[in-house]
């Protein structure tokens, strides 16, 4: 996450040049594939099914083999979270800029979980557990396993960077400051686990500052006096936060551009299928490269035709 933030902020001066290599069809494919992947993988925690798998096809196969037997408490926590995430920003637009709906949803379901299960005992409903020290603040020696984990982290960071870059540069009104803010937020998230990144760029500095101050106070409370209680947050609620956030990040307008011609349809389908059928990090990188080549060739052809 920190690596993706550094890359995103570093790209700010080159925003206009990079925009030429962003394919709307590839953006649609990547965003839709990301939302579908998050939905399939996190449904396991939402319904407390107990499935196993690291990629979409493995998780779907696990659902088929084990059967779809949701736990009522998981459904309850997740559904309450979804209702808050969807209705709170619509009913309280100004307040939602400072107090994130995700924070309210997690607090509400935490209190409900403490009421239904006051004393911790192993159940089908998983809880997030104690929040450990941020990894960037640890200085353990890097061995062979650590090097492999570092390489994997860099690949995932690059994939996340491409997702964020496509998400932001896909909008014509995106400014350089949006990339800088997005990068800084990602760096803060890696340093302060539990911080919430807005799914859409925040344009108003006052709202951003208020949200940061509120988030800092809440994080301090979670880390110090309320740590034993914050560990009881149901993973079902966290799963729904990820699912809703993923679908809110989808640029639905780009889907129309994806069907503008047979070539864009092929590019959209390739981006979608590659990301769904492989590891999401590898799929994102491969799809982004294909999209950049297509967009670059198209841009060069347009320039040659304009010069002629």
What are the functions of these language-model segments?
Residues 31-39, 130-143, 155-164, 238-251:
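Hydrophobic transmembrane alpha-helices of secondary-active transporters
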Residues 79-92, 124, 157-171:
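Juxtamembrane interface elements at the cytosolic ends of transmembrane helices
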Residues 183-188, 255, 307-308:
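Cytosolic juxtamembrane regulatory segments of multi-pass membrane proteins
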Residues 1-111, 115, 213-307:
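Membrane-embedded alpha-helical modules
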Residues 47-59, 120-135:
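Peri-membrane helix termini and adjoining interfacial loops of integral membrane proteins
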Residues 141-210:
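Membrane-embedded helical hairpins/re-entrant loop segments and their flanking transmembrane helices
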């Amino acid at each position: 996450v920190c690596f993706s933030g550094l890359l995103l902020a570093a790209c700010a001066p080159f925003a206009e040049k990079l925009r030429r290599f962003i394919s709307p069809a590839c953006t649609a494919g990547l965003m839709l594939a990301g939302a579908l992947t998050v939905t399939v993988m996190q449904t396991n925690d939402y319904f407390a099914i107990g499935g196993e798998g690291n990629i979409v096809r493995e998780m779907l196969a696990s659902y088929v083999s084990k059967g779809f037997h949701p736990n009522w408490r998981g459904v309850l926590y997740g559904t309450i979270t979804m209702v808050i995430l969807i209705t709170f920003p619509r009913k309280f637009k100004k307040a939602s800029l400072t107090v994130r709906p995700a924070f309210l949803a997690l607090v509400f379901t935490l209190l409900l979980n403490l009421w239904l299960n006051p004393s911790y005992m192993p159940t089908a409903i998983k809880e997030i557990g104690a929040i450990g020290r941020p990894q960037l603040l640890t200085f353990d020696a890097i061995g062979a396993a650590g090097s492999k984990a570092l390489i994997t982290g860099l690949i995932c960071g690059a994939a996340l960077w491409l997702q964020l870059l496509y998400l932001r540069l896909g909008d014509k009104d995106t400014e350089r400051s949006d990339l800088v803010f997005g990068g800084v937020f990602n760096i803060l998230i890696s340093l302060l686990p539990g911080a919430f990144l807005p799914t859409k760029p925040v344009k108003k500095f006052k709202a951003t500052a208020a949200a940061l101050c509120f988030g800092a106070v809440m994080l301090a409370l979670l880390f110090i006096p309320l740590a034993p209680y914050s560990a009881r947050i149901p993973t079902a609620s966290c799963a729904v936060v990820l699912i809703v956030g993923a679908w809110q990040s989808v640029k639905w307008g780009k889907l129309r551009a994806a069907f503008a011609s047979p070539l864009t349809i092929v590019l959209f389908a390739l981006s979608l299928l590659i990301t769904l059928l492989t590891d999401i990090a590898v799929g994102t990188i491969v799809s982004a490269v294909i999209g950049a080549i297509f967009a670059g060739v198209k841009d060069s052809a347009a320039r040659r035709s304009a010069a002629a």
